[in-house]
């Protein structure tokens, strides 16, 4: 076919190569973009999975890292037993008085910042109630101001604060039966008043703090760990010296094996802030409890050994017996103390 003397088919054939070149160039660019996006997707996929792997490994490492616990009073009755029981499960900081003076706010702040514990377990205290009566200023400095210094520093540094209060806060209550944490209290002795003040002020400074109202505790000397006068040792001393032991009939209180106190402490590290009764429940008076314990001892009659005291606490019965329902629920059943008598039976079976 000819158009104006020119072969139209030849013209069309001559125009084809530029279009083909353009198509080829576009195809190459599309291919490059395709390869770029594929590489990008692969890179992002690898980066995602690699990041997840790093995160997973970090979680494993963190799970296997010992939690660092600052224990005050680590050389004392409860503190030494806590360290002995949990030293392989936690990284325990047990400073001396020279390293950490709890009555010095700057010393407390500096130690916590420098050592970065996750938990402060405050067990140091003046626990002799008679001594506190005779030395109220010293008792307040240690049992109140020391607690407040630790509570404030813990709050400022995001540290969980656990500290011991006492069943002595109930020393003044006239109600019968096991007492819960919600009952109004008005302690009659210096020690109990200072413990109550420490609870109130510490929780004001550090709302996530946990105050454990501990009972009277007992144990024997083990592996050089200190021991003080307690229910079991008082009876043992009476047996050894053939000296009658006079015990009140108008007193009700829980008495707890120190082993159980120490065993449940890690479970308190995750409790919501607040006050918790902490120790064995008991429905018997102190004289009756002692008589039942003596009956466990082979061939021992409690009659000549124990004498009831009906005169002590004449105005009203001294009731320090506590209900532990709150801590049982809050811990999901993890903190579950046996009764005083069941604890004594187990303790005696393991002597």
Task: Label the predicted regions.
Residues 105-142:
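NAD(P)H-binding glycine-rich loop region in Rossmannoid oxidoreductase-like domains
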Residues 91-108:
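Adenosine-cofactor binding site in Rossmann-like domains, unifying the SAM/SAH pocket
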Residues 203-253, 260:
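NAD(P)-dependent short-chain dehydrogenase/reductase
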Residues 264-312, 348:
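Mid/C-terminal beta-alpha module of Rossmann-like enzyme folds, strongest
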Residues 68-85:
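N-terminal Rossmann NAD(P)H-binding glycine-rich loop of SDR-like oxidoreductase domains
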Residues 285-291, 306-336, 341-346, 350-351:
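Conserved C-terminal active-site "lid" loop/helix of NAD(P)H-dependent oxidoreductases
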Residues 134-162:
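NAD(P)-cofactor binding segment of oxidoreductase domains
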Residues 141, 146-149, 169-212, 217-218, ...:
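Catalytic helix-loop patch of NAD(P)-dependent Rossmann-fold dehydrogenases
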């Amino acid at each position: 076919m000819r158009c104006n003397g020119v072969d139209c088919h030849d013209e069309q054939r001559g125009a084809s190569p530029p279009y083909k070149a353009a198509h080829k160039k576009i195809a190459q660019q599309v291919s490059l973009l395709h390869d770029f996006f594929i590489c990008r997707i692969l890179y992002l996929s690898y980066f995602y999975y690699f990041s997840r792997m790093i995160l997973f490994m970090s979680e494993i490492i963190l799970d296997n890292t010992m939690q660092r616990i600052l224990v005050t009073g680590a050389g004392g009755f409860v503190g030494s037993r806590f360290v002995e029981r949990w030293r392989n499960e936690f990284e325990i900081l047990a400073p001396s008085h020279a390293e950490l003076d709890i009555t010095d706010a700057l010393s407390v702040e500096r130690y916590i910042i420098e050592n970065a514990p996750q938990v402060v377990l405050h067990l140091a205290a003046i626990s002799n109630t008679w001594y506190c009566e005779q030395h109220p200023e010293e008792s307040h400095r240690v049992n109140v101001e020391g607690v407040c210094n630790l509570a404030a520093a813990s709050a400022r540094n995001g540290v969980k604060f656990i500290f011991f209060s006492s069943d002595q806060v109930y020393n003044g209550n006239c109600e019968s039966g096991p007492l819960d944490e919600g009952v109004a209290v008005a302690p009659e002795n210096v020690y109990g008043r200072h413990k109550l003040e420490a609870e109130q002020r510490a929780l004001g400074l550090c709302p996530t703090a946990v105050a454990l109202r501990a009972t009277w505790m007992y144990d024997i000397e083990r592996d050089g760990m200190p021991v003080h006068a307690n229910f079991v040792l008082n009876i043992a001393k009476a047996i050894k010296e053939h000296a009658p032991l006079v015990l009140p009939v108008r007193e009700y209180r829980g008495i707890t094996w120190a082993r159980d106190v120490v065993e449940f402490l890690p479970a308190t590290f995750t409790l919501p802030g607040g006050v918790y009764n902490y120790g064995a429940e008991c429905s018997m008076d102190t004289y009756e409890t002692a008589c039942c314990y003596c009956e466990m001892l082979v061939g021992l009659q409690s009659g000549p050994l124990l004498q009831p005291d009906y005169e002590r606490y004449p105005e009203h019965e001294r009731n320090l017996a506590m209900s532990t329902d709150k801590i049982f629920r809050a811990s999901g059943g993890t903190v579950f103390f046996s009764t005083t008598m069941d604890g004594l039976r187990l303790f005696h079976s393991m002597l």
